[in-house]
């Protein structure tokens, strides 16, 4: 195994444990839930294939689903986000960037990185909450949960980016 693969596995284990033990238990005001494992998917290098990204997304989702006793909704949402990530990232990159760059403030600048992250995270929550609520009569709850969870998760993304050594 290469050093990058070992680092990915280490990051996967640490984020999965943090998600399951801490963040899945926190529901601010009964609406907002942070899914910090999305940071891992956001920070995968651009050259990571779409299939690899989707496998990582599915693995994070299934670990969260098993720990939280949810029937596959995190898996579906994380896989949907992983599928669309490539296309969203392509909209914010230019030809001068190397193929193996890691999305972040250094490569995309603050504006590009924030929009990229918000769009990816919005796809995750726009898939997750309709599957969880499964009823249109809860539209207001769906909207509040989606917006508040995107905001809370973005807060963690920005804080992580501030403390990232690769800034």
Q: In which residue ranges do the predicted regions lie?
A:
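Terminal, non-globular segments
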Residues: 1-167
């Amino acid at each position: 195994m290469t050093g990058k693969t070992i680092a990915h596995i280490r990051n996967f284990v640490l984020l999965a444990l943090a998600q399951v033990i801490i963040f899945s238990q926190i529901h601010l005001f009964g609406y907002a839930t942070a899914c910090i494992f999305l940071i891992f998917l956001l920070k995968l290098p651009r050259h990571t294939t779409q299939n690899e990204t989707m496998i990582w997304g599915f693995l994070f989702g299934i670990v969260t689903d098993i720990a939280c006793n949810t029937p596959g909704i995190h898996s579906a949402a994380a896989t949907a986000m992983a599928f669309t990530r490539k296309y969203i990232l392509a909209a914010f990159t230019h030809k001068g960037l190397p193929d193996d760059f890691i999305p972040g403030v250094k490569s995309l600048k603050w504006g590009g990185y924030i929009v990229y992250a918000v769009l990816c995270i919005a796809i995750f929550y726009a898939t997750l909450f309709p599957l969880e609520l499964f009823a249109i009569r809860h539209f207001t709850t769906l909207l509040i949960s989606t917006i508040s969870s995107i905001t809370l998760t973005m807060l963690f993304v920005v804080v992580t980016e501030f403390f990232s050594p690769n800034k």
